[in-house]
């Protein structure tokens, strides 16, 4: 995926001692996204706004807060996370590359 005429913040968002890294992208329409990579491990993220996570490469398992269901996602798939919630994401082998879109 390409973002034409977008603003990219050069300073990275670094989480979990560098195991999750992303960069903020603001499109010409004003949409805020992050483009990043998750190294193998298990991590929990909270949400303020609703989010859509698109998996670009690799795979992961996700458990949304308030559920016990584990969903598997791979390249070409996406999952939504409600606002004021969160999710636990597990990456097992290769890094998982993603685009996170902030909704609403």
What is each residue range found by the language model?
Residues 1-31:
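A short, N-terminal "cap"/entry segment at the start of jelly-roll beta-barrel domains
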Residues 47-62:
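Short, conserved beta-strand element in jelly-roll/cupin
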Residues 29, 66, 91-93:
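A generic beta-sheet turn/junction motif
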Residues 26-48, 80-83:
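Conserved short histidine dyad/triad with adjacent acidic residue
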Residues 67-84:
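Short acidic-glycine-tyrosine-enriched beta hairpin
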Residues 82-104:
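Ligand-binding loop in jelly-roll beta-barrel domains
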């Amino acid at each position: 995926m390409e973002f034409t005429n977008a603003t990219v913040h050069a300073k990275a968002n670094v989480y979990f001692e560098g195991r999750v890294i992303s960069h903020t992208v603001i499109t010409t329409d004003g949409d805020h996204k992050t483009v990043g990579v998750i190294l193998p491990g298990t991590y929990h993220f909270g949400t303020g706004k609703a989010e859509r996570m698109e998996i670009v490469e690799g795979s992961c398992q996700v458990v949304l807060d308030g559920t016990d269901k584990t969903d598997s996602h791979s390249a070409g798939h996406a999952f939504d996370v409600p606002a004021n919630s969160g999710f636990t994401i597990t990456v097992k082998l290769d890094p998982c590359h993603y685009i996170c879109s902030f909704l609403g």
